[in-house]
Amino acid sequence: YPEYNIGGEAWMNYTIGSAYWQKGSRLNFGQDTELKSVMDFRLMGIASKAFHEETGYSGGLHTIFEHMCYDYVYPDIYNVLRFLENHDTDRFLPSMPKSVDDLYAFKQGVTFLLTIPGIPQLYYGQELLMNGTKEKGDGYIRLDVPGGWPGDKVNQFEASGRSEVQNDAWNFLRTLLKWRKGNDIIAKGKMKHFMVNQ
């Protein structure tokens, strides 16, 4: 306080629906919500597939490109909360990568998230490659980070308690976050769209 901000979890699977709820939106016909930040659930929904599949005219990174073309409908894109996963959804990674060479989806996803306009949100455990789907229930995607409680056999808060793949992901994300923190052009810069020419 006084810079306190509340994010609105208006779970809309389309950009215009989310933009409607943001403060200053012209889409809600003068009934301003005064809600400074809204969440980009549409991005989260398409990112979970886009970074894991082949890019073509109607799939993969092309869906991300199309989604980003609608940033202009938000009154303030820099106050849109963007994320790849959260406590109510499948994890971004459906399963644990088997080797460092299998980290391409993770690295592309977090790099994208941390270099686009908006407020990036990382869900706990993302840096440790926590993975899974809601098929087994919400508890499965909300597991404790090993090492946080007495009696835990593994401590993933220490490098020695993480696998080689987890340490690679941890170090990559740590480096990326430090780089972003020192670069206003990345954290607060503008995005320009170009036509895709395949």
Task: Give the residues covered by each predicted segment.
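Active-site-proximal helices and loops of the catalytic beta/alpha 8
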Residues: 1-75, 102-103, 112, 129-175, ...
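Structural preference for beta-strand elements that scaffold enzyme active sites
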Residues: 3-7, 79-82, 120-121
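Active-site-proximal beta-strand/loop segments in catalytic clefts of secreted hydrolases
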Residues: 9-11, 84-87, 124-128
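Active-site clefts of carbohydrate-active enzymes
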Residues: 75-100
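Conserved interdomain hinge at the start of the Helicase C-terminal
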Residues: 108
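C-terminal substrate/ligand-recognition segments
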Residues: 114-126, 165
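Carbohydrate-binding surface patches
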Residues: 178, 193-198
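Surface-exposed helix-capping loop/turn segments at secondary-structure junctions
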Residues: 181-193
